[in-house]
Amino acid sequence: MSLSVFWFLPTHGDGQYLGTNEGARPVDHAYLQQIAQAADRLGFGGVLIPTGRSCEDAWLVAASLIPVTQRLRFLVALRPGVISPTQAARQAATLDRLSNGRALFNLVTGGDAEELAGDGVFLDHRERYAESAEFTRVWRRVLEGETVDYEGKHVHVRGARLLFKPVQQPRPPLWFGGSSEVAQDLAAEQVDVYLTWGEPPAQVKEKIERVQAKAAAQGRKVRFGIRLHVIVRETNEEAWQAADRLISHLDDETIAKAQEALARTDSVGQQRMAALHGGKRDRLEISPNLWAGVGLVRGGAGTALVGDGPTVAARMQEYADLGIETFILSGYPHLEEAYRVGELLFPHLDLVVPEIPRPAAILAQGEHIAHQFVPQKVSQS
């Protein structure tokens, strides 16, 4: 099976090591542009742009990089409870039009109650997913060209519609990751691509089978992707040395502080990530060539595939055999590691390289009348 491989834009910081400012580098627009253009040229299918208060705004970053890339797609976050579904639909359509169909959207419910409260969201885990389901129902229908009346517990709109259609039809794809039962129910009902963090293959297999069964019960099919870090070198020995070097500045106090902060989340996925290593340095290779060292101090995706090109490709194929079609990878620092992946890993993959999209036909229609109607040709009397 051909695989699509995405890269990652480190809008929350980057450097040579984890958990220290030693070897850190400034992440300004010029640096993000370097990474995006490298990914564009190397054949990555797109880039994931993270979201949250520790990151630059994903939508603005994506918009700023459209003119300097040709084929790269941008996976940006939708935040139910933080923005209305109709406004999000308008923004999504605009980003898709400006990028000539290169926009993808990632539904993010959040898991940190403290951060969510700062954004004005005070719902518990189950209610956040209920709100996300309502949000997504409206968002999808509006983008697909419907005029929507909807009254739910959390979302209420009347006459919601879109005047400027997206390039991708019927709408840009919706991605989503979540490990709880309610998250998987949402995925089965609403999303196009279900994402998992890089757990061992047996655990990923269980997730895929559950989501597939839930989707089939609703007459739907869902595609699957996985989010992993990667440390690829010319030899396996060099790759493991690089993994050790990445956490060589970490002390036990920093690890404990990070694990304490991550433990307050109600994210089931984050809890599963933490359980893989237990905050201990001595149990980091949790599956062949799957290393949990990143998760000692990083929230979210916390595991990396480690090895030479053929070894990492073989481990990726194990996930592909389970149904994974898209791999979202990253490595520290992100510019250099993008080139290493392109040079050492890509030759061993059956890689899907996106084509440069042809310009979409945007029809001339004049200014909308009273902000409501597309003007029509006036008949001659």
UniProtKB/Swiss-Prot annotation:
InterPro entries listed in its UniProt record? Alkanesulphonate_mOase_FMN-dep, Luciferase-like_dom, Luciferase-like_sf, SsuD_RutA_monooxygenase
Entry keyword annotation includes Oxidoreductase? yes
Q: What is its EC number?
A: 1.14.14.5
GO BP, one example?
A: alkanesulfonate catabolic process
Task: Write one Pfam family the protein is assigned to.
Answer: Bac_luciferase
Q: Catalyses which reaction?
A: an alkanesulfonate + FMNH2 + O2 = an aldehyde + FMN + sulfite + H2O + 2 H(+)
Arranged from A to Z, the UniProt key words for this protein are: Flavoprotein, FMN, Monooxygenase, Oxidoreductase
Looking up Gene3D superfamilies in the UniProt record yields: Luciferase-like domain
Subunit notes for this chain?
Homotetramer.
What is this protein identified as?
Alkanesulfonate monooxygenase
